[in-house]
From Swiss-Prot:
It catalyses: L-arginine + H2O = urea + L-ornithine. Keywords: Arginine metabolism, Cytoplasm, Hydrolase, Manganese, Metal-binding, Urea cycle. Pathway: Nitrogen metabolism; urea cycle; L-ornithine and urea from L-arginine: step 1/1. The gene is CAR1. This is Arginase. Mn(2+) 2 binds at D216, H218, D322, D324. Substrate binds at H218, A219, D220, I221, N222, S229, G230, N231, D273, T336, E367. It comes from the Eukaryota. It comes from Eremothecium gossypii (strain ATCC 10895 / CBS 109.51 / FGSC 9923 / NRRL Y-1056) (Yeast).
Length: 399
């Protein structure tokens, strides 16, 4: 989560094979393990992998899980390969697009426009073309969260804007919860990643045993004691798990905090604070960094992640997808880009594979920020990627 505290643009090509970590320490290149056997016709994917080799920080680390099993020993029972996307929890194929134009979990403006741009790019029509009946929910309409943020000076302990975040995420929680209980698949468009406090808790109200795939460059599990920035988009997982509840500001006291460590798995991590690493280890949380994607390949990583949170392969799974999990070559208009990320195809494969299991019950797509684009093409690239994530999760295939 380190770059939640300091946005860097090292991905622009600064430096000769070295990048700076969260605290300024030089991080060197790391050999890739699986790429020689992996053929790609896309030159940009190959270039992204070279950037990954040069720019990804950190050591090999481990895959942390609640039962201490090695990653390679994970079984994938109940998950057949080569299936078509299907949705056993939503045979009627009804979904709710929940608009969450909220930026109060961090300091930059523009991310509140993400949902508007995703819709303008044709996300709704694309999903309807896949056979889904769509309704649009706007739980934040009529509230002046963005205007209030411009005037906000509230800090409780280290937490910035806890009242804004608490109120907005509660409204989002209620909308997602209602959609899930009505038999609709909630697809929430953010907004910054603090909105997941509302989305995940809303889904867990309907599916208390659901597993959560958190696809992100950052772990977002800082507590109010460990966060350096105070930005709550770097803390949603700690709230969802009920960590250090005694320190929570009153506006966030409504959060149930029922997510169990054994029910979350990360994919795509590459910028994690030291305190977050300790939390992951202490709680035994399954976490796959870009090292593991490089070593095992994305297919095996996804299978291991799904097996960790859904051992028998039959339970519900939700996906909370921060677009910065994908390398900024493909997703430049986002608030905390970190080079060395997933290729576009790797990023889409994750949700394609979840769709094939039939277990998807909810999706978040967050952190598209058109205002941070250097030019219009960056906006198009980022927004099109966000739309592709949603379409692939809801059944779009290459063949």
């Amino acid at each position: 989560m380190a770059q939640r505290n300091c946005w860097r643009r090292s991905w622009l090509g600064v430096g000769g094979g070295l990048c700076l970590g969260a605290h300024g320490a030089a991080r060197g290149p790391r050999q890739l393990f699986h790429l020689t056997a992996k053929q790609s016709s896309a030159a940009s994917d190959a270039k992204c992998r070279r950037w990954r080799a040069a720019g990804r920080g950190g050591g090999a680390g481990g895959v942390y899980n609640g039962r201490g099993a090695a990653a390679g020993s994970r079984q994938t029972s109940g998950m057949a390969h080569n299936e078509h996307p299907h949705y056993k929890f939503f045979e009627s194929k009804k979904a709710s697009l929940v608009m969450a134009p909220f930026s109060g979990g961090q300091g930059k403006s523009g991310v509140e426009d993400g949902p508007k741009y995703l819709l303008k790019q044709g996300l709704r029509e694309g999903v309807e073309g896949l056979g889904w009946e769509i309704e649009v929910q706007r739980p934040l309409d009529g509230h002046d969260f963005e205007e209030r943020k411009q005037r906000a000076t509230e800090v409780v302990g280290r937490a910035k804007n806890p009242t804004l975040v608490g109120e907005a995420t509660h409204l989002i929680h209620d909308a997602v919860r209602a959609a899930a209980h009505a038999g609709r698949l909630p697809v929430t468009l953010g907004g910054d990643h603090s909105i997941a406090i509302g989305t995940v808790s809303g889904v867990l109200d309907r599916y208390p045993d659901a597993g959560l795939l958190w696809v992100d460059a950052h772990a977002d599990i800082n507590t109010l004691a460990s966060t350096e920035s105070g930005n709550l988009h770097g803390c949603p997982v700690s709230f969802l798990m009920g960590l250090e509840r005694e320190s929570w500001p009153a506006p966030l006291a409504w959060v149930p905090g029922t997510l169990r460590p054994s029910k979350i798995a990360y994919i795509g991590l590459r910028d994690v604070d030291p305190e977050e690493k300790e939390i992951l280890r202490r709680l035994g949380i399954t976490a796959f960094s870009m090292y593991h994607v490089d070593r095992y390949g994305i297919n095996k990583v996804v299978e291991m992640a799904l097996a960790a949170i859904n051992p028998d392969g039959t339970g519900p799974v939700m996906v909370s997808y921060d677009v910065d999990a994908i390398d900024p070559m493909y997703v430049p208009a986002t608030g905390t880009p970190v080079r060395g990320g997933l290729t576009l195809r790797e990023g889409l494969f994750i949700v394609e594979r979840v769709a094939e299991t039939g277990n998807l019950v909810a999706l978040d797509v967050v952190e598209c920020n058109p205002e941070l684009a250097a030019h219009d093409l960056h906006v198009v690239d980022t927004v099109q990627t966000g739309c592709s994530i949603a379409r692939c999760a809801l059944g779009e295939t290459l063949l």
